[in-house]
Amino acid sequence: MIRLGGWCARRLCSAAVPAGRRGAAGGLGLAGGRALRVLVDMDGVLADFEGGFLRKFRARFPDQPFIALEDRRGFWVSEQYGRLRPGLSEKAISIWESKNFFFELEPLPGAVEAVKEMASLQNTDVFICTSPIKMFKYCPYEKYAWVEKYFGPDFLEQIVLTRDKTVVSADLLIDDRPDITGAEPTPSWEHVLFTACHNQHLQLQPPRRRLHSWADDWKAILDSKRPC
Protein backbone atom coordinates (compact mmCIF):
# COMPACT_ATOMS: atom_id res chain seq x y z
CA MET A 1 0.00 0.00 0.00
CA ILE A 2 1.33 3.44 -0.91
CA ARG A 3 1.54 5.66 2.15
CA LEU A 4 2.64 8.94 0.65
CA GLY A 5 0.38 11.26 2.61
CA GLY A 6 2.67 11.19 5.64
CA TRP A 7 6.06 11.77 4.07
CA CYS A 8 5.03 14.92 2.21
CA ALA A 9 4.91 16.80 5.50
CA ARG A 10 7.42 14.76 7.46
CA ARG A 11 10.15 13.13 5.40
CA LEU A 12 11.11 15.98 3.11
CA CYS A 13 12.12 18.08 6.11
CA SER A 14 14.33 15.39 7.59
CA ALA A 15 17.97 14.80 6.79
CA ALA A 16 18.75 11.82 4.59
CA VAL A 17 19.96 8.76 6.44
CA PRO A 18 22.16 6.56 4.24
CA ALA A 19 20.88 3.06 3.62
CA GLY A 20 24.12 1.16 4.09
CA ARG A 21 25.08 -0.38 7.42
CA ARG A 22 27.29 2.14 9.15
CA GLY A 23 29.64 2.31 12.06
CA ALA A 24 28.73 4.26 15.15
CA ALA A 25 30.42 7.44 13.89
CA GLY A 26 27.52 8.48 11.63
CA GLY A 27 28.78 7.55 8.19
CA LEU A 28 32.16 6.15 9.14
CA GLY A 29 32.96 2.55 8.35
CA LEU A 30 33.85 0.04 11.03
CA ALA A 31 37.52 0.61 10.35
CA GLY A 32 37.09 4.38 10.64
CA GLY A 33 37.01 5.16 6.89
CA ARG A 34 34.19 6.91 5.06
CA ALA A 35 31.46 4.69 3.69
CA LEU A 36 31.41 4.15 -0.08
CA ARG A 37 28.66 6.30 -1.56
CA VAL A 38 26.84 4.99 -4.63
CA LEU A 39 24.27 6.89 -6.68
CA VAL A 40 21.91 4.75 -8.74
CA ASP A 41 19.85 6.30 -11.52
CA MET A 42 16.18 5.37 -11.71
CA ASP A 43 14.76 5.47 -15.27
CA GLY A 44 16.58 2.99 -17.48
CA VAL A 45 18.57 1.56 -14.56
CA LEU A 46 15.98 0.53 -11.99
CA ALA A 47 12.73 1.17 -13.89
CA ASP A 48 12.11 0.05 -17.47
CA PHE A 49 11.52 3.47 -19.02
CA GLU A 50 12.12 2.37 -22.62
CA GLY A 51 9.87 -0.68 -22.49
CA GLY A 52 7.15 1.17 -20.60
CA PHE A 53 7.24 4.05 -23.06
CA LEU A 54 7.02 1.82 -26.13
CA ARG A 55 4.06 -0.14 -24.79
CA LYS A 56 2.09 3.00 -23.95
CA PHE A 57 3.04 4.79 -27.17
CA ARG A 58 1.80 1.90 -29.31
CA ALA A 59 -1.39 1.61 -27.27
CA ARG A 60 -2.21 5.33 -27.53
CA PHE A 61 -1.06 5.84 -31.12
CA PRO A 62 -1.62 2.48 -32.85
CA ASP A 63 -1.55 4.00 -36.33
CA GLN A 64 1.72 5.87 -35.85
CA PRO A 65 5.20 4.53 -36.66
CA PHE A 66 7.35 3.54 -33.71
CA ILE A 67 10.97 2.68 -33.01
CA ALA A 68 11.68 -0.86 -31.86
CA LEU A 69 13.94 -1.11 -28.84
CA GLU A 70 16.73 -2.69 -30.85
CA ASP A 71 16.68 0.35 -33.16
CA ARG A 72 16.85 2.97 -30.43
CA ARG A 73 19.81 5.31 -30.74
CA GLY A 74 20.56 8.28 -28.55
CA PHE A 75 19.44 9.10 -25.03
CA TRP A 76 16.56 11.40 -25.99
CA VAL A 77 13.55 9.38 -27.14
CA SER A 78 11.71 12.47 -28.38
CA GLU A 79 14.56 13.48 -30.70
CA GLN A 80 14.67 10.12 -32.48
CA TYR A 81 10.88 10.06 -32.83
CA GLY A 82 10.95 13.62 -34.17
CA ARG A 83 13.32 12.51 -36.93
CA LEU A 84 11.03 9.62 -37.78
CA ARG A 85 8.01 11.81 -38.62
CA PRO A 86 6.96 15.41 -37.93
CA GLY A 87 4.78 15.64 -34.83
CA LEU A 88 5.95 12.37 -33.31
CA SER A 89 8.24 14.14 -30.85
CA GLU A 90 5.28 15.85 -29.20
CA LYS A 91 3.34 12.58 -29.13
CA ALA A 92 6.27 10.83 -27.47
CA ILE A 93 6.58 13.53 -24.82
CA SER A 94 2.86 13.28 -24.07
CA ILE A 95 3.37 9.67 -22.98
CA TRP A 96 5.75 10.36 -20.10
CA GLU A 97 3.93 13.55 -19.15
CA SER A 98 0.77 11.50 -18.52
CA LYS A 99 -0.51 10.44 -15.14
CA ASN A 100 0.78 7.08 -13.87
CA PHE A 101 3.51 6.72 -16.49
CA PHE A 102 6.37 6.68 -14.00
CA PHE A 103 4.47 4.81 -11.30
CA GLU A 104 3.48 1.99 -13.65
CA LEU A 105 6.98 1.30 -14.97
CA GLU A 106 8.17 -2.24 -14.34
CA PRO A 107 11.48 -2.84 -12.55
CA LEU A 108 14.33 -4.00 -14.75
CA PRO A 109 15.31 -7.63 -14.12
CA GLY A 110 17.24 -8.02 -10.89
CA ALA A 111 17.32 -4.28 -10.15
CA VAL A 112 15.35 -4.25 -6.91
CA GLU A 113 17.13 -7.27 -5.48
CA ALA A 114 20.58 -5.94 -6.41
CA VAL A 115 20.07 -2.48 -4.93
CA LYS A 116 18.58 -3.89 -1.74
CA GLU A 117 21.63 -6.13 -1.41
CA MET A 118 23.93 -3.22 -2.23
CA ALA A 119 22.33 -1.09 0.47
CA SER A 120 22.87 -3.85 3.02
CA LEU A 121 26.63 -4.06 2.40
CA GLN A 122 29.00 -2.94 5.12
CA ASN A 123 30.32 0.61 4.72
CA THR A 124 28.10 1.36 1.72
CA ASP A 125 25.62 4.21 1.34
CA VAL A 126 23.20 3.91 -1.58
CA PHE A 127 21.03 6.71 -2.95
CA ILE A 128 18.60 6.68 -5.85
CA CYS A 129 19.59 9.80 -7.81
CA THR A 130 17.03 10.72 -10.45
CA SER A 131 16.14 13.72 -12.59
CA PRO A 132 12.42 14.54 -12.73
CA ILE A 133 10.99 15.86 -15.98
CA LYS A 134 10.22 19.57 -16.15
CA MET A 135 6.47 18.94 -16.40
CA PHE A 136 6.28 18.13 -12.71
CA LYS A 137 2.55 17.58 -12.18
CA TYR A 138 2.93 13.80 -11.74
CA CYS A 139 6.58 12.80 -12.09
CA PRO A 140 8.15 13.63 -8.68
CA TYR A 141 5.25 12.16 -6.69
CA GLU A 142 5.21 9.01 -8.81
CA LYS A 143 8.94 8.49 -8.45
CA TYR A 144 8.57 8.51 -4.67
CA ALA A 145 5.54 6.21 -4.93
CA TRP A 146 7.48 3.80 -7.16
CA VAL A 147 10.39 3.62 -4.72
CA GLU A 148 8.05 3.00 -1.80
CA LYS A 149 6.24 0.27 -3.74
CA TYR A 150 9.38 -1.69 -4.60
CA PHE A 151 11.86 -0.74 -1.84
CA GLY A 152 9.64 0.11 1.10
CA PRO A 153 8.98 3.38 2.96
CA ASP A 154 12.40 3.56 4.63
CA PHE A 155 14.09 3.91 1.25
CA LEU A 156 12.26 7.20 0.65
CA GLU A 157 15.04 8.78 2.69
CA GLN A 158 17.49 7.62 0.02
CA ILE A 159 16.03 9.56 -2.93
CA VAL A 160 17.89 12.50 -4.45
CA LEU A 161 15.82 14.46 -6.98
CA THR A 162 18.01 16.78 -9.02
CA ARG A 163 18.27 18.15 -12.53
CA ASP A 164 22.07 18.31 -12.11
CA LYS A 165 23.78 15.16 -10.87
CA THR A 166 27.26 16.66 -11.15
CA VAL A 167 26.76 18.63 -7.92
CA VAL A 168 25.94 15.50 -5.89
CA SER A 169 28.97 14.10 -4.07
CA ALA A 170 29.58 10.35 -4.36
CA ASP A 171 32.11 7.72 -5.39
CA LEU A 172 30.05 6.04 -8.11
CA LEU A 173 27.12 6.98 -10.33
CA ILE A 174 25.42 4.13 -12.17
CA ASP A 175 23.46 5.75 -15.00
CA ASP A 176 22.32 4.88 -18.53
CA ARG A 177 22.88 8.37 -19.92
CA PRO A 178 26.24 8.42 -21.73
CA ASP A 179 26.98 12.12 -21.26
CA ILE A 180 26.24 13.67 -17.89
CA THR A 181 27.19 17.32 -17.61
CA GLY A 182 26.28 20.19 -15.33
CA ALA A 183 27.56 22.98 -13.15
CA GLU A 184 30.46 20.90 -11.81
CA PRO A 185 32.98 20.17 -14.59
CA THR A 186 34.75 17.45 -12.58
CA PRO A 187 32.17 15.52 -10.54
CA SER A 188 33.41 13.54 -7.57
CA TRP A 189 31.89 10.30 -8.83
CA GLU A 190 32.98 7.82 -11.47
CA HIS A 191 30.22 7.37 -14.04
CA VAL A 192 29.55 3.70 -14.74
CA LEU A 193 27.39 3.44 -17.86
CA PHE A 194 24.46 1.09 -17.39
CA THR A 195 23.76 -0.65 -20.67
CA ALA A 196 20.42 0.20 -22.26
CA CYS A 197 18.96 -0.24 -25.73
CA HIS A 198 19.89 3.32 -26.71
CA ASN A 199 23.56 3.11 -25.66
CA GLN A 200 24.57 -0.51 -26.24
CA HIS A 201 26.26 0.36 -29.56
CA LEU A 202 28.57 2.98 -28.03
CA GLN A 203 32.26 2.19 -27.71
CA LEU A 204 33.60 3.53 -24.41
CA GLN A 205 37.14 4.78 -24.18
CA PRO A 206 39.17 3.54 -21.18
CA PRO A 207 39.02 4.06 -18.29
CA ARG A 208 35.24 4.34 -18.73
CA ARG A 209 33.37 1.14 -17.97
CA ARG A 210 29.91 -0.41 -18.12
CA LEU A 211 27.54 -2.36 -15.98
CA HIS A 212 25.81 -4.47 -18.61
CA SER A 213 22.86 -5.51 -16.44
CA TRP A 214 22.08 -6.27 -12.79
CA ALA A 215 23.26 -9.83 -13.48
CA ASP A 216 26.70 -8.34 -14.16
CA ASP A 217 29.29 -8.20 -11.35
CA TRP A 218 28.29 -4.90 -9.74
CA LYS A 219 30.01 -5.92 -6.50
CA ALA A 220 33.38 -5.94 -8.27
CA ILE A 221 32.79 -2.38 -9.43
CA LEU A 222 32.02 -1.26 -5.89
CA ASP A 223 35.01 -3.14 -4.50
CA SER A 224 37.29 -1.44 -7.03
CA LYS A 225 36.47 1.91 -5.40
CA ARG A 226 37.15 0.77 -1.86
CA PRO A 227 40.55 1.32 -0.24
CA CYS A 228 42.84 -1.69 -0.38
From Swiss-Prot:
InterPro entries: 5'(3')-deoxyribonucleotidase, HAD-like_sf, HAD_sf. One of its GO terms (cellular component) is mitochondrial matrix. Highly expressed in heart, brain and skeletal muscle. Detected at very low levels in kidney and pancreas. Mg(2+) binds at residues 41, 43, 176. GO terms for molecular function: 5'-nucleotidase activity; metal ion binding; nucleotidase activity; nucleotide binding. One of its GO terms (biological process) is dUMP catabolic process. Its main location: mitochondrion. This is 5'(3')-deoxyribonucleotidase, mitochondrial.
